[in-house]
A protein has these predicted regions:
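Histidine-centered catalytic micro-motifs
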Residues: 10-21, 165-171
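Conserved beta-strand termini and adjacent loop/short-helix elements that scaffold enzyme active sites
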Residues: 2-3, 93, 197-199
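Short, basic, glycine/proline-bearing loop/turn elements
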Residues: 8-16, 198-203
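Divalent metal-coordination and catalytic microenvironments
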Residues: 4, 15, 35, 90, ...
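Histidine-rich, glycine-flanked metal-binding segment
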Residues: 1-10, 25
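Histidine/acidic residue-rich metal-binding segments in metalloenzymes
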Residues: 76-77, 110-136, 142-266
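Divalent-metal coordination cores built from histidine and acidic residues
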Residues: 24-132, 225-227
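Acidic, glycine-rich active-site loops and adjacent beta-strand->loop/helix elements
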Residues: 17-20, 44-47, 171-173, 200-202
Length: 266
């Protein structure tokens, strides 16, 4: 009896980091009790495809939740969750960071032709397994080493399967407008639908930019590009301390980064 109650379809968590917590506890009570019935993974990192280095790094850096990794591809990971038994539905983008680490590692370098081909083939594989498209998080290492051209090339493959490109853009602050332009360029050049993760303008100096962001998106949509955004339902944000560190400090992966942090000048 739903008299005097509001009835709604299940909510979609477009940016879920339940990739590990669902392994530990598939009941997902924290989201289920808020009405979330679909968890979408893949903001930059996805739990597949995994090469040996990625698998070892995930195992090495596990926190309180410990688990074995008996999968390689993204499809195998999602199948693992399904067979384990979880309350929510799940879906995932292919992490652009995950693709880059598979082919290039953690270095600040442009992928050569063979490395780019590896990334493209992994996109083909992931999309055939049911991935939603490509997800990027360009404010974090090693994602911020990716060029616009690199992202266009891998998005072209996802577009062949009617996938989407979704991005935590390079900047949500002083270079917000330029970052929106980059996303629109990727969408146009790759012929792909695109969405901006958690659209915001960080820093008081940038609060006046939202109208121009909306104008850019409206203009792109009027020209035929399929662009959408999502937003928080609150006026706060949080991230890790790594987001405030320059790219050269983080180059080469976590071990080299930690070694550099021992330098008092840093």
């Amino acid at each position: 009896n739903a008299t005097d109650r509001a009835v709604s379809p299940g909510f979609i968590n477009m940016l879920s980091w339940g990739v590990e917590t669902l392994i530990e506890d598939g009941k997902s009570q924290s989201d289920i009790r808020q009405g979330v019935t679909l968890e979408v993974f893949g903001e930059g990192m996805s739990w597949g495809p995994l090469n040996h280095e990625l698998r070892e790094n995930i195992l090495k850096n596990q926190g309180d939740i410990k688990y074995d990794i008996n999968w390689t591809t993204l499809g195998e990971y999602l199948q693992f969750l399904e067979e384990k038994g979880i309350s929510t539905n799940v879906a995932s983008f292919i992490g652009a960071t995950t693709l880059r680490i598979n082919a290039v590692g953690y270095e600040n370098k442009k992928p050569n032709d063979s490395e780019l081909e590896i990334m493209k083939n992994l996109v083909h594989q992931g999309m055939k397994e049911g991935a939603m498209g490509i997800g990027s998080s360009l404010i974090y290492a090693p994602a911020f080493y990716s060029s616009t051209e690199e992202l266009v090339e891998i998005c072209k493959i996802a577009a062949q399967y009617d996938g989407m490109y979704i991005s935590h853009m390079r900047s949500e602050g002083n270079r917000l407008l330029e970052s929106v332009d980059e996303l629109l360029t990727i969408a146009n050049d790759a012929g792909i639908r695109a969405e901006i993760y958690h659209l915001k303008q960080s820093g008081k100096n940038n609060w006046n930019k939202l109208d121009r962001v909306i104008q850019k998106i409206d203009s792109a949509r009027a020209e035929g590009l399929k662009i959408t955004t999502d937003m928080y339902t609150y006026i706060a944000g949080a991230t890790g301390l790594d987001a405030s560190m320059p790219p050269w400090v983080q180059e080469g992966g976590l071990d080299k980064w930690i070694e550099r942090l021992k330098n008092p000048k840093i």
